[in-house]
Amino acid sequence: MKLIRMNKVSLIFFFIVSSIISQNNTEVYLFDITKTTDGYELNNKLNISNNEGYDNQPHFYDNNTLLFASSRDGQTDIVKYTIDTGEKKFINYTKNGGEYSPQRIPNSKDISAVRLDNSGLQRLYKYNINSGVSEEIIPNLKVAYPLWYNDHVLFSAVIGENALELVKSDLNNNSNNILEKNIGRSLHKIPNTNLISFISKK
């Protein structure tokens, strides 16, 4: 899995390394990428998760802060990593479940994450990045992979009866509309357009 953020000539690069033996042992690495005459060069490899177990789904909160899901004590919580200091801090501790897919909510300091409770209940929550206090964003929708389009509209891969469904949610009017059935996990905004991309499995 790759997550790239451009910054003029140089950029920061994430690479998730999975163990050949166990897919649950993953790490999040940080690189400097320098543009050269032949292309790009990776330098200064740094394992920023450095944790046994599941570490995945990195997301830039801002130019100096990264979010990712990381396992501890048998569950998965949200980590905030500060680039210039190397500080790593868990922002929440959910006793009855775990979090995945952390993202910053546009025009907000809060973040969202998918919470999977031990009971099997799966929902999208909002978290205060400092206190970790959370609240449910979309009731009764089993969000698996969210994509924020703006601060009140998001597209999600939602778990349906037999496959993932592409759902558009508008928080201003509490609407959820199924746009496509049988899609993949990958949702992205297309740069410099008003479009998003998704994988259709039809």
Feature-to-residue mapping (PLM):
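Sequence signature of WD/YWTD-type beta-propeller architectures
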Residues: 22-202
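Bacterial Sec-dependent N-terminal signal peptides
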Residues: 1-25
